[in-house]
Design a protein with these regions (language model features):
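Conserved amphipathic alpha-helix within the SDR
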Residues: 1-13
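Conserved mid-core segment of classical short-chain dehydrogenase/reductases
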Residues: 25-40, 83
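Active-site helix of classical SDR
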Residues: 54, 90
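Residue(s) in the substrate-gating loop at a strand-loop-helix junction
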Residues: 74
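Active-site-adjacent segment of SDR/Rossmann-fold oxidoreductases
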Residues: 79, 100-111
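Active-site loop-to-helix junction immediately N-terminal to the catalytic Tyr of the SDR YXXXK motif
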Residues: 80-88, 100, 128
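C-terminal helical subdomain
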Residues: 114, 130-165
Length: 193
C-alpha cells in the first residue's frame, strides 16, 4: 500500500479523500482452536488493511493541511456477537483505531470519519440465515455513507435505526446482554475466509 500511495501522491499530490472499505466475515467461535486462524485473517483484512490504507496517505494530507480519511467499520464493533467474535473484534478495533487517528490529527485540517453501517445487502450478508433488521441496498448504503463523509461526521451509524439499536446495546448491563446474546443467531461457519 505504501508504494501505491507514494506513486499516487507523486503524480497527483495529497488526495482530498481516502476511504478504507475492506471487510471479510466468517462465523467463528472463541472456544475452538481452529478458529484462531480465521480470527487472524479477519483482523489482517479488517484492521491492518484499513490502517495501512489510511496511514499511507495521512502524512501527505497532514502536510497539505486538508482532506478526509474515512474508515468503514460496523455496528458489530460495538458489542461482541456470538458466532461472530472475529468480525466484532475486528470492527471494534477499527472503530478504536480511527478514534485514535482522529485525536492524532486533531487541528491538522484532516478529518477522520468512522462509518458503522448495519446490514447491507451484499454477497457477504446473503449467506446469513437469520433476519437482518433495517437491511439497506448497497446503493442506499453508499448514498448514506457519502453524506456522512461529506458532512465529516466523526462517527456515523447507518441507518439511524441501527444507531438506536447500537446505543441500547452499549448501554445495556453486561448481565442482560449476556443473556440476550446467548440466544442470538450465529453466522454460518462454512464460509471461506
Amino acid at each position: 500500500m505504501e508504494g501505491a500511495a507514494r506513486d499516487f501522491i507523486a503524480r497527483f499530490g495529497a488526495p482530498d479523500l481516502v476511504i478504507a472499505n475492506a471487510g471479510v466475515s466468517v462465523g467463528t467461535r472463541g472456544d475452538e482452536v481452529a478458529d484462531v486462524a480465521k480470527l487472524r485473517r479477519v483482523l489482517e483484512v479488517n484492521v491492518t488493511g484499513l490502517a495501512a490504507t489510511l496511514a499511507a496517505f495521512a502524512p501527505a494530507m497532514r502536510e497539505a493541511g486538508r482532506g478526509t480519511l474515512a474508515g468503514i467499520a460496523s455496528v458489530a464493533g460495538f458489542r461482541g456477537l456470538p458466532g461472530a467474535g472475529a468480525y466484532s473484534a475486528s470492527k471494534s478495533a477499527a472503530i478504536t483505531w480511527l478514534e485514535s487517528l482522529r485525536a492524532e490529527l486533531h487541528g491538522s485540517g484532516v478529518a477522520v470519519v468512522c462509518v458503522c453501517p448495519g446490514y447491507i445487502d451484499t454477497p457477504m450478508t446473503r449467506v446469513n440465515r437469520f433476519r437482518m433488521p433495517f437491511l439497506l441496498s448497497a446503493d442506499e448504503a453508499a448514498r448514506r455513507i457519502v453524506r456522512a463523509i461529506e458532512a465529516r461526521r466523526r462517527l456515523a451509524v447507518i441507518p439511524w435505526q441501527m444507531a438506536l439499536v447500537s446505543l441500547a446495546l452499549r448501554a445495556m448491563p453486561g448481565w442482560l446482554f449476556d443473556r440476550l446474546a446467548a440466544r442470538a443467531p450465529r453466522e454460518p461457519k462454512d464460509v471461506p475466509v
